[in-house]
A protein has these predicted regions:
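His/Met- and acidic-residue-enriched segments that coordinate or traffic transition-metal cofactors
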Residues: 3-6, 21-180
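Bacterial N-terminal signal peptides
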Residues: 8-18
């Protein structure tokens, strides 16, 4: 999976909030990135990483990759549950963006990962995880947090951000250990 695809997705996500001229940026951000949309993105980001990580549990060629997939899946299930509990508490209906480019990126990532085997799968999965977590971290910091209105939703994003960073670094360490 190419890193540029995820970085482009993060930029596209940020563009949803900052696309118009500077004078209208705040109004556009609030219209494009309201809390129900942020809740939907938060849920999707966790669900997608659960899906790719569950694939690593079954397809990983090394114990390290399978274990990393298991940890990521477990962690993202817990974070997704926290998000869903908050959505219920706040009585919010998550509303995905109209043009959710990240969904197409996830579908492509799954195609790539499903077609890879052995060490090629391990490398593709780890590269995906590094790029994916970087894109999510960038989107949280540059777009989602600034647009979030509800204090509890903002608090949840801040609370889980270090785990996203730790996941990115863990995948990078394992990728580095694989060598070229």
């Amino acid at each position: 999976m190419r890193v540029t695809s995820y970085l482009a997705s993060a930029i596209a996500l940020a563009a949803l909030a900052f696309a118009p001229a500077a004078a209208n940026a705040r109004a556009a951000r609030s219209a494009a990135m309201d809390d129900p949309t942020i809740c939907a993105i938060f849920d999707a980001a966790n669900s997608w990483d659960i899906e790719t990580s569950d694939l690593a549990i079954t397809k990983g060629s090394t114990k390290e990759v399978r274990d990393l997939g298991a940890m990521f899946s477990r962690d993202h299930k817990a974070v997704r549950a926290q998000g869903r509990d908050l959505v219920k508490k706040l009585n919010v209906t998550p509303t995905p963006p109209k043009d959710f480019a990240l969904a197409a990126d996830h579908e492509q990532a799954m195609k790539t990962l499903n077609s890879a085997t052995g060490k090629a799968f391990d490398r593709a999965y780890l590269e995906h995880e590094v790029a994916y977590h970087k894109a999510v971290i960038d989107a949280i910091n540059s777009t989602l947090l600034p647009a979030t209105q509800n204090a509890e939703l903002k608090e949840l994003q801040v609370k889980v951000a270090p785990a996203f960073q730790a996941h990115m670094l863990a995948a990078q360490r394992l990728l580095d250990a694989m060598g070229k």
